[in-house]
Design a protein with these regions (language model features):
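Conserved ATP-dependent adenylate/AMP-binding module captured primarily in the ANL superfamily
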Residues: 92-124
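Anion (oxyanion) recognition and catalysis
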Residues: 81
Length: 163
């Protein structure tokens, strides 16, 4: 690794210099789940490969809306940025009308939400968001694709050269 010049260089720097068994940790149902530096990078690379498979190109926008700090947000951020796309972080407590405006104005192609409360508001306006192809949730919800489908889509490493 040369020097850290981009935000998504940090996990790689950490892996090389200070690898951690608990690089990130998120509490799910009262239990802390730790993610190692290597797993963080592996999942971010899978997200990158999946987004490329889904047709995301440099400068395309991917929105992330989370009610809390969580590991998935960090993984998505690195996965989005390292393929040259742009993460559009959106404040989780704005109105549905504000989501419509921000998602349209940013021309977001995909949206990742944390939970049902955010999903409800996004779905209220999803049909009015012209570039939006799909919404995924970090939480497992009945009426929404799960972000793990994206990670699984990126399991095939054939796009790794572009990452």
């Amino acid at each position: 690794m040369q020097e850290v010049t981009r935000l998504f260089d940090f996990p790689y720097y950490q892996l090389e210099k200070f690898p951690q068994e608990a690089s990130l940790a998120t509490k799910y149902n009262g239990q802390w789940v730790r993610t190692s530096t290597q797993s963080y990078i592996d999942q971010a690379n899978a997200v990158s490969r999946a987004l490329l498979r889904l047709g995301v190109k440099p400068n395309d926008k991917v929105a992330v809306i989370s009610m809390s700090n969580r590991t998935e947000w960090n993984i998505m951020d690195v996965g989005i940025l390292q393929i040259g796309a742009q993460n559009v972080p959106i404040y989780p407590t704005i109105s549905a009308a504000d989501y419509e405006y921000v998602l349209n104005h940013s021309e977001a192609k995909y949206c990742f939400v944390s939970c049902s409360a955010v999903l409800e508001k996004v779905l209220m306006v999803a049909s009015k968001i012209k570039n939006l192809k799909e919404v995924y949730s970090f939480d497992e919800l009945e009426n929404c694709k799960n972000w793990k489908e994206v990670v699984d889509l990126g399991a095939d490493e054939s796009y790794q050269e572009e990452v």
